[in-house]
């Protein structure tokens, strides 16, 4: 939690919003650095490698890095951006798929989906995704992430 102290409540809100945006951008960049860096390293290795078996392994790692990057960007777009269309509700299966992909990318995390509604309010989906990300980060040794929501 970030606390910004100011006697001017307007300035405090502006500073807090700016600090929050900076922290969010730092988090997104941090989360994307690993798979994008692995992709760059794989391309460099692929350019110098001549052994067909090693080149095949490089291609598999490149595909894995691209998939992880894509999954994270889709997750971030809905969790922090304006994704989900123009409606007020988002199909719950979209959030379920993003959380499952996030857990799969981290490895050793199983997910259980306990949301009965076919759609959820867009703000609720954003909160659900953020809580799921925090919980997945806390499962450093693996485990089961149970995701639920009710009205």
Placement of each model-derived feature along the sequence:
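Conserved ATP-binding N-box helix of the HATPase_c
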Residues: 22-42, 49, 122-149
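Conserved DHp (HisKA) dimerization/phosphotransfer helix of two-component histidine kinases, i.e.
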Residues: 55-109
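Glycine-/small-residue-rich active-site loops that bind phosphorylated ligands and cofactors
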Residues: 87, 119-120
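Amphipathic alpha-helices that form helix-helix packing interfaces
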Residues: 32, 39, 46, 62, ...
């Amino acid at each position: 939690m970030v606390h910004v102290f100011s006697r001017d409540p307007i300035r405090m809100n502006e500073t807090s919003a700016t600090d929050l945006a900076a922290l969010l951008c730092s988090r997104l960049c941090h989360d994307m650095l690993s798979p994008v860096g692995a992709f760059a390293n794989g391309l460099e290795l692929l350019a110098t490698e001549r052994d067909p078996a090693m080149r095949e392994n490089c291609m598999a790692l490149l595909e894995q890095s691209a998939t992880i990057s894509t999954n994270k960007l889709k997750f971030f777009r809905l969790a922090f951006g304006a994704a989900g269309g123009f409606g007020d509700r988002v199909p719950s299966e979209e959030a379920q798929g993003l959380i499952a992909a996030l857990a799969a990318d981290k490895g050793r995390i199983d997910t259980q989906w306990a949301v009965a509604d076919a759609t959820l309010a867009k703000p609720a989906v954003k909160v659900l995704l953020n809580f799921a990300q925090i919980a997945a980060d806390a499962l450093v040794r693996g485990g089961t992430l149970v995701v639920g929501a009710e009205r």
